[in-house]
Amino acid sequence: MKTDKEIAEIIYYDCGEVTALGFYINGFLSDQIKYNYKFLIKREKPSFLKHPSFTGEWGKFVLRLGLFEFKNGNNNFFFSIDRSDHSTNFKNEGYIIPLLEIVKYYFKANYNATAIDNDPEIKKYRDKIIPIGPSFPLHIENMIKFMPRVLPGKNNNWTFKESKERLNLMFRNPRLSYLRGLRNTETDLNVFFVMPYYPNQKILNEFRFEVMKALQKHVKTNLIIGFAPTQKLPENHQYFEQPVYEMRTYFRNLARSKVAIYVRGPHDGLSSKLGQLLALGKPIIGQTIHNNKELYYQNPFFNEQFAYDEPEDIAKQVQELLQHPEKAASFAKANANTFDTKFSPEITVSKIIEKLFD
């Protein structure tokens, strides 16, 4: 049996964006007793970031990832978690090449084996790149440990923008228990489909716009659809404008919907909505999943729910499912169970931990 001095450590370097990592951090915090390790937070950059290879664009992109260190006796190494949208190395945003050279494992949510094999530069690191499950922004349970990063200042090299992001994490994002608690919400809406508008993602916006038009055509009544923009919408999109909802209000409205809709995120990546809708236990109709397919399509009813890549088909299938509430209920029950047994923070991170100890 290990003594306290021999207990393994997993160290998170709190030196960048953490909103996308809150899901995984909750998992690391929760799994400490089960796997007999300590989860520690260092408010500094790992030593390897001082290397000249991390200047320029690499230095900018690397802080979007989660940077960690595993220490277990003489078995010490760095690993990273990448929740970025790209499955390819488009504009060097899909992978951080210098980081791939350093870490033992590069855990990636938007894992795509074909994209890896098609890129000779990335393929060299194939064995390091490990697929992981979905995530979405969550309140971190031990948020007090992140408090020193709230106030900007020269001493901690923390900007106002980064401090604002940290405050959002503290007060804006809900706890997972809140989402699970919404599973029994009375469903008095047919559809709630309100999406952000990304000025730099024209194709994505147009697809969502076409889905909205198709929903209006086929579902027609008792629906809330539109964009919730942070700046003025193009004139032809303004008919579908919605207010920016407070986060908990947004989820309450999602929970009210009889059928939820899933569309892919930027660059055809996994949207955080996937995990959120599963956590809410909603029946889903939506686009096919492009990345990490093997992880998802083995689950009950995923082949039926994530099967439609045309806006008209999505809207028609939503209307069809609305006519069959028993089928929708079976989807909902299965999705809640899939999240609880396969995609919760604790279970998702347990797969990472088992790899670290392997």
Language model features with spans:
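Catalytic donor nucleotide-activated moiety binding site of glycosyltransferases and closely related
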Residues: 209-247, 290
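Short, aromatic/basic amphipathic alpha-helical patches
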Residues: 20-32, 93-98, 116-127, 207-214, ...
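N-terminal pre-catalytic "stem/leader" segment of glycosyltransferase-like enzymes
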Residues: 1-94, 111, 193-199, 204, ...
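Catalytic core of nucleotide-activated saccharide and alditol-phosphate transferases
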Residues: 73-202, 209
